[in-house]
């Protein structure tokens, strides 16, 4: 596929009609079943050694899927000789792998684009690009182009595997390259990658989301559900085991929708995959993120059966009020959610449960917000990621008139966060005087005399003792705060 290009020196005012821009209406469509392509990557002959003696930097915003995309792009860039550089200012190539979930993330990206634009003006050989979920948004790409930033290339989430082809066009055609596919992509296997952690790694099990929550842009930026074949997933896990990995996290926009897009009659769903991954023998298995109304009890039963599946579930509810949930297009009854949590705790008593909550959805009343507080008290979550509703152009919720002032939304967020702090500390204190198995990361970032790692429940544990990165050691917990457990290593 030929990208749409334009001579960046030809005019100050760009003719946007010449670009193949993202189209939010097209992105909503679910056109065809995804193909699984095993040989969708090759190095363009013209740039096989182009990166030798050059460095690159990728700044990643957002979720685990973006982090995994970054690892894939790192792998491809290093195949042509590039070396990673921590310093943006001295790198020859910089990519911004962006997130579109909230306005704050977009603001930070545009600030970075401005910084990179200034570097480009002082060093014409410097190359920088914008990719990821923001690049899938019409308004964002239009803003970049109309602002006349000296960006070299823009591409989205569906053609990450083509980064070297796009770079080739930038190098030899000296033009701005824009290649954003609005329709969902295929499943491209056998891509190179450079994992950023040599103990714990992410494995994509599926891509995209078909839930269309009214506030969420992800179904448009990531496309429809596309599940990977179990054989490819298990091969990747086995490869990680052979390389010494201790922990794998299965990731997707909604992992427990895995397999629903397979051909009729192929009854292989997430609980089946989770069991097969556990059977590989890798020491720790995690997964994220789950949608509660697809979270079957068979998943809980599988977790109970295999001790190497870690007892932590991230289960976003977003609101404690059913009217708000209906407006969000999240058809979950609060009673059903409570029943699910009760089932989890009855079968996996040591399981930690975390959630996501949105405050100030358009026209949320004080009474509706109070129901979120009531649910939080009932569940006593281990932790929560809390946010003020962020309007996303192209979503259904974006056109709803909203009468709630921002000041009131901030007050509600503060009230909710105080509750989160209270129960996080209360739950952590339950581990005092207990012994936990901790996978060691290494010295704590804040105190090099202390070792840090994670418990099975996804709790940060700081402890004294002598342990090497990658070891799983027993730690007696002696104290707890909201964010961490503290203890000492025991024999």
UniProtKB/Swiss-Prot annotation:
EC number(s) per entry: 2.8.4.3
PROSITE patterns: MTTASE_N, MTTASE_RADICAL, RADICAL_SAM, TRAM
SUPFAM superfamilies xref list: Radical SAM enzymes
Domain MTTase N-terminal: 54-172
InterPro entries to which the protein is assigned, alphabetical: Elp3/MiaA/NifB-like_rSAM, Methylthiotransferase, Methylthiotransferase_CS, Methylthiotransferase_N, Methylthiotransferase_N_sf, MiaB_methiolase, rSAM, rSAM_horseshoe
Chain sites annotated for binding [4Fe-4S] cluster 2: 209, 213, 216
GO molecular function, one term: 4 iron, 4 sulfur cluster binding
Keyword Iron-sulfur (UniProt): yes
Annotated TRAM domain residues: 429-491
Reaction(s) the record says it catalyses: N(6)-dimethylallyladenosine(37) in tRNA + (sulfur carrier)-SH + AH2 + 2 S-adenosyl-L-methionine = 2-methylsulfanyl-N(6)-dimethylallyladenosine(37) in tRNA + (sulfur carrier)-H + 5'-deoxyadenosine + L-methionine + A + S-adenosyl-L-homocysteine + 2 H(+)
Group of enzyme by EC: transferase
Cofactor requirements of the protein: [4Fe-4S] cluster
HAMAP family named among the record's database cross-references: tRNA_metthiotr_MiaB (MF_01864)
Protein name (Swiss-Prot/TrEMBL): tRNA-2-methylthio-N(6)-dimethylallyladenosine synthase
Organism: Malacoplasma penetrans (strain HF-2) (Mycoplasma penetrans)
Gene from which this protein is expressed: miaB
